[in-house]
Amino acid sequence: MPIITQILARQILDSRGNPTVEVDVYTESSFGRAAVPSGASTGVHEAVELRDGDAAVYLGKGVLKAVENVNTVINDALTGMLVTEQEEIDQALLDLDGTPNKSKLGANALLGVSMACAKAGAEYSGLPLYRYIGGTMASTLPVPMMNVLNGGAHADNTVDFQEFMIMPAGFDTFSDALRCGAEIFHALKALLKSKGLSTAVGDEGGFAPNLSSNEEAIELVIEAIGKAGYKVGSPTDKGGLGDAQVMIALDPASSEFYDSAKKRYVFKKSSKRELTSLEMAEYWEKWASDYPIISIEDGMAEDDWEGWKVLTEKIGSRVQLVGDDLFVTNSKRLAEGIERGVANSILVKVNQIGTLTETLDAIDLAKRNGYTSVISHRSGETEDSTIAQIAVATNAGQIKTGSLSRSDRMAKYNELLRIEEELGDQARYPGRKAFRV
């Protein structure tokens, strides 16, 4: 029987050398293990990541309180439950915590248990996790958003915008798309080196050179695509792919440079320029006309609903507008966005909400309302590759899991290669069809 016999948590280190929670779930006949990621630029509406706050130990970032919550309160409550009853398990976790933002037990405690239970349930059922969650229809490999150049909170340079990404959508298989991304990554490295710029990589494996402007950053990426021998889209594509193989995606992380007191977007790392919400929306409108941009994530700040509305009206018909800090994988926030008519896509980060069931609910709500979903990592990752399984399980069609370096990022890409191989002729790579613009 798949009855939970023990839940055991421990403190491990993530890809930035910070503590995080890992959970083991044991049943009478199966086992599941999951490790929890952590973000650098976090939305104010995210579920609470419980940290110890003892400055003398791991600079206050220890997670022993969360570990203790798993090993006592959660273990005692869930032992004896059927591991295959995921919704019941997740509801029990929510009831145990009893707060709207998981601040009592910690979202990092709840998520580790939720994901480990799913893995134990999959093992008991004799199924890969993507089949266990998604059933027989789970067969879509995601188009990757590959973060090759960094700025903002992810880099100590003069670039305001956090992530410049490539999306190899013009291919028939995930493996070919991955090869394209890797070759562009190496072409970009050679290009930076030829210009005497740094090729050190940041938290997510992307380069973070000291550039003169935000425009130089995107232009370098476009140049690297060409040097790798691939065709990039053109502004005349209006967000479409045409016969191009690669498009650009951005994550400016606009909340990070929004001054709520001034109600201005301040380019504090580069020109010191200050823009109103309307001017910021017009700025992105110009970029979407000048560059082959298919997707912009967090183009406006997390609580600038009016700015989001203007941006959506201006370019939402031809550019995927992804809400990350805006929606924080929260169905209530997403429902508000749908009602207001803002954005057209949601970034899905499992640790923003805290349980697998809530994550799947948000993806389902997005699908029912014509919004796309992008399954995402965090800047602080581990070797855990659950998000690769979730991307295929939900047929999301897109994944954001870093650059083409660092083994914590490669773990997800390599898992997707294995899934594609396992699916064989059933595997489907959506390419341009992953977008609804």
Curated annotation (Swiss-Prot):
Name used for this protein in its record: Enolase
InterPro entries noted in UniProt: Enolase, Enolase-like_C_sf, Enolase-like_N, Enolase_C, Enolase_CS, Enolase_N
Xref: NCBIfam families: eno
RNA-binding among keywords: no
Subcellular localization(s) per the UniProt record: Cytoplasm; Secreted; Cell surface
Pfam families: Enolase_C, Enolase_N
EC number: 4.2.1.11
CDD domains reported for this sequence: enolase
GO molecular function, one term: magnesium ion binding
Family of this protein: Belongs to the enolase family.
Function in brief: Catalyzes the reversible conversion of 2-phosphoglycerate (2-PG) into phosphoenolpyruvate (PEP). It is essential for the degradation of carbohydrates via glycolysis.
Residues the entry annotates as binding (2R)-2-phosphoglycerate: 162, 349, 378-379, 400
Residues forming coiled coils: none
Pathway(s): Carbohydrate degradation; glycolysis; pyruvate from D-glyceraldehyde 3-phosphate: step 4/5
Cross-referenced SMART domains: Enolase_C, Enolase_N
Gene Ontology CC: cell surface; extracellular region; phosphopyruvate hydratase complex
HAMAP family from the UniProt entry: Enolase
Catalytic machinery residues: 204, 349
Entry binding sites for Mg(2+): 251, 297, 324
Record keywords: Cytoplasm, Glycolysis, Lyase, Magnesium, Metal-binding, Secreted
Cofactor details (free text): Binds a second Mg(2+) ion via substrate during catalysis.
Cofactor: Mg(2+)
Catalyzed chemical reaction(s): (2R)-2-phosphoglycerate = phosphoenolpyruvate + H2O
